[in-house]
UniProtKB/Swiss-Prot annotation:
Keywords: Chloroplast, Plastid, Ribonucleoprotein, Ribosomal protein, RNA-binding, rRNA-binding. The gene is rpl14. Signal peptide: none annotated. InterPro entries: Ribosomal_uL14, Ribosomal_uL14_bac-type, Ribosomal_uL14_CS, Ribosomal_uL14_sf. This is Large ribosomal subunit protein uL14c. GO terms for molecular function: large ribosomal subunit rRNA binding; structural constituent of ribosome. It comes from the Eukaryota. GO terms for cellular component: chloroplast; cytosolic large ribosomal subunit. Binds to 23S rRNA. Belongs to the universal ribosomal protein uL14 family. It is found in: Plastid, Chloroplast. SUPFAM superfamilies: Ribosomal protein L14 (SSF50193). It holds the Pfam family Ribosomal_L14.
Length: 122
């Protein structure tokens, strides 16, 4: 459950380390973002000499949340951190590698490129 002002770790090699959510996209007044939702965020911590710099506004898709996700078959999926992957306007990841597991719900949200780059899909 991500809301504005929430901090997320970045799960790719785009150059950002942490981003802060400033808006959840999809709907006029959407309050919370879940796995597979697109957000607008600002880079709060970045690696030096990389493409993304601090205070840059970016789009990202949420790939892991601490809030549990209930599936139709009754299983509950919960992660240890809130994490996102930075994407461009077309929805493709800006980095070339994804770190850590991602949820299967990203495939249903049409982020197949992120799912194919991920080392593990839960």
């Amino acid at each position: 459950m991500i809301q504005p002002q929430s901090y997320l770790n970045v799960a790719d090699n785009s150059g950002a380390r942490k981003i802060m959510c400033i808006r959840i996209l999809g709907g006029s007044n959407k309050k919370y973002g879940h796995i597979g939702d697109t957000i607008i965020g600002v880079v709060k911590e970045a690696i030096p000499n990389m493409t993304l710099k601090k205070s840059e506004v970016v789009r990202a898709v949420i790939v892991r949340t601490c809030k549990e996700l209930k599936r139709k078959n009754g299983t509950i999926l919960r992660f240890d951190e809130n994490a996102a992957v930075i994407i461009n306007q077309e929805g493709n990841p800006r980095g070339t590698r994804i770190f850590g597991p991602v949820a299967r719900e990203l495939r249903e949200a049409n982020f197949t490129k992120i799912v194919s780059l991920a080392p593990e899909v839960l």
